[in-house]
């Protein structure tokens, strides 16, 4: 891994870990109210667009956990998902030249979150295909 890539990965990991430790139940509730904003962020072109399907699955998993439909999820997974999605929703840099760098950082945070929670996401997807579908 090149030095700039390693630095970005380390920064993204630090950011995700820091934010995950601070997630509260109120943060989960606030995130679940911002579905439309997430659709905009992941629906546009750019580094986040490639995560659109995973973002929808991650959001649905958190929503189903929160509503009690899918209670098997560890809090650490919920916190990590809320932290990553919340990071994507945080305001971009006010300096236009840094906006692209912000998006790349957001993509790195999402990639780390998805990687860290791949087992939980796969299990949730299996649960969905067994016929228990979220509303």
Where do the protein language model's features map onto the residues?
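Terminal, membrane-proximal amphipathic helices
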Residues: 1-79, 112-135
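Membrane-inserting effector segments that mediate pore formation, membrane fusion
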Residues: 75-110
């Amino acid at each position: 891994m090149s030095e700039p890539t390693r630095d970005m990965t380390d920064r993204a990991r630090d950011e995700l870990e820091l934010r995950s430790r601070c997630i509260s139940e109120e943060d989960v509730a606030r995130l679940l109210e911002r579905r439309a904003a997430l659709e905009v962020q992941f629906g546009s072109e750019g580094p986040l667009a490639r995560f659109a399907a995973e973002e929808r699955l991650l959001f649905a998993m958190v929503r189903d956990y929160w509503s009690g439909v899918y209670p098997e999820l560890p809090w650490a997974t919920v916190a990590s998902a809320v932290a990553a999605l919340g990071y994507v929703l945080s305001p971009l840099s006010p300096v236009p030249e840094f906006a692209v760098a912000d998006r790349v950082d957001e993509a790195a945070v999402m990639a780390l979150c998805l990687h860290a929670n791949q087992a939980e996401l796969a299990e949730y997807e299996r649960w969905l295909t067994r016929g228990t579908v979220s509303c």
